[in-house]
């Protein structure tokens, strides 16, 4: 399963969460660590670049957040990111630099690398999206199959 490793899938220079991936082989191994990591990292972010808004929410001063967007912590919104109308960030979300979280898009327990685009009616849960990933309108990532059976990965 070499092609499914963090080393093969991601450019860790394109996220402020590089440290989160240290010591793991597969991307899903970081999922239970995202919230704690965000709190740790958030408390070290430079105050001249990030503003703390509420409990465990850090938003880059250069980011654009629509007034109708909802952000629950822990969350970090990176530099030049755009959080659009009615976006719903449920927590444990790290949104990379220049990323777009679109209208009516929902995030939960995610790392979005720099310049990721989830622009239209997406659900991104328990996921890691790499540099410049783009999800088409209405796309869903989730850790639960509709029939509740385990997912099997084969190569």
Report the location of each language-model feature.
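LRR N-terminal entry segment and analogous cap-like coil->beta motifs
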Residues: 64-68
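Periodic glycine anchor positions in long extracellular repeat architectures
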Residues: 60-63, 78
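Flexible, glycine/small-residue-enriched loop-and-beta-strand segment within the central core
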Residues: 42, 69-155
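Terminal amphipathic alpha-helical/low-complexity segments used for targeting or macromolecular assembly
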Residues: 1-56, 61
């Amino acid at each position: 399963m070499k092609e499914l490793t963090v080393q093969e899938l991601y450019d860790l220079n394109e996220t402020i969460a590089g440290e989160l991936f240290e010591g793991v082989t597969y991307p899903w191994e970081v999922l239970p660590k995202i919230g704690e990591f965000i709190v740790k990292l958030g408390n070290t972010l430079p105050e001249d670049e990030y503003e703390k808004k509420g409990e465990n929410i850090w938003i880059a001063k250069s980011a654009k957040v629509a007034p109708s967007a909802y952000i629950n912590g822990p969350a970090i919104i990176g530099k030049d990111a755009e959080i659009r109308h009615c976006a719903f960030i449920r927590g444990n979300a790290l949104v990379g630099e220049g990323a777009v979280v679109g209208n009516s898009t929902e995030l939960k327990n995610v790392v979005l690398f720099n310049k990721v685009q989830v622009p239209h009616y997406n659900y991104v849960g328990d996921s890691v999206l790499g540099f410049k990933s783009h999800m088409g309108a209405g796309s869903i990532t989730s850790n639960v199959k509709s029939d509740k059976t385990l997912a099997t990965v084969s190569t």
